[in-house]
């Protein structure tokens, strides 16, 4: 018989740097998960992606065991890194926070393709371009 799912917890953690301190501790500790075990497994899986923010969905079962799925970094994080800025524009349509090239957008779209609801690379690029514009980034050729 399958294990009963008690909770699904969504977290965004820096790759290879999960610790039992907040936000991991409070989110998973109250569900009875072994925090050190989660941190070791997460850090091992994401060790090659150092410096990236990785969304993770942790499924907790009734016997206190867990599984987790890592996703690709958020598009906004990747766009900010590509444009070399700390935050998007406070007034996206009026103030330009930075610039990204179509080549950078293509690279981000290729990376995000598995998590996006897009059939091809062109559609994925349009989604990423929309995110860039809503952050106040200018898309240049």
Curated annotation (Swiss-Prot):
NCBIfam families: L11_bact. Keywords: Methylation, Ribonucleoprotein, Ribosomal protein, RNA-binding, rRNA-binding. Belongs to the universal ribosomal protein uL11 family. One or more lysine residues are methylated. SUPFAM superfamilies: Ribosomal L11/L12e N-terminal domain, Ribosomal protein L11, C-terminal domain. Part of the ribosomal stalk of the 50S ribosomal subunit. Interacts with L10 and the large rRNA to form the base of the stalk. L10 forms an elongated spine to which L12 dimers bind in a sequential fashion forming a multimeric L10(L12)X complex. GO terms for cellular component: cytosolic large ribosomal subunit. GO terms for biological process: translation. PROSITE patterns: RIBOSOMAL_L11. Forms part of the ribosomal stalk which helps the ribosome interact with GTP-bound translation factors. Coiled coil: none annotated. InterPro entries: Ribosomal_uL11 (IPR000911), Ribosomal_uL11_bac-typ (IPR006519), Ribosomal_uL11_C (IPR020783), Ribosomal_uL11_C_sf (IPR036769), Ribosomal_uL11_CS (IPR020785), Ribosomal_uL11_N (IPR020784), Ribosomal_uL11_N_sf (IPR036796). It comes from the Bacteria. One of its GO terms (molecular function) is large ribosomal subunit rRNA binding. The lineage of its organism: Bacteria, Thermotogati, Thermotogota, Thermotogae, Thermotogales. This is Large ribosomal subunit protein uL11. Pfam families: Ribosomal_L11, Ribosomal_L11_N.
């Amino acid at each position: 018989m399958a294990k009963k799912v008690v909770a699904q917890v969504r977290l965004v953690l820096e790759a290879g740097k999960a610790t039992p301190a907040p936000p991991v501790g409070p989110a998973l500790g109250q569900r009875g998960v072994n925090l050190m075990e989660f941190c070791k497994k997460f850090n091992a899986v994401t060790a090659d992606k150092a410096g990236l923010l990785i969304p993770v969905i942790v499924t907790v079962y009734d016997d206190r065991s867990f599984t987790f799925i890592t996703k690709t970094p958020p598009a906004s994080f990747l766009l900010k890194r590509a444009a070399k800025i700390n935050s998007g524009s406070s007034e996206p349509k009026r103030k330009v926070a930075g610039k990204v090239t179509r080549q950078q957008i293509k690279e981000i779209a290729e990376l995000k393709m598995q998590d996006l609801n897009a059939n091809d690379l062109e559609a994925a690029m349009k989604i990423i371009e929309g995110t860039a514009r809503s952050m106040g980034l200018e898309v240049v050729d």
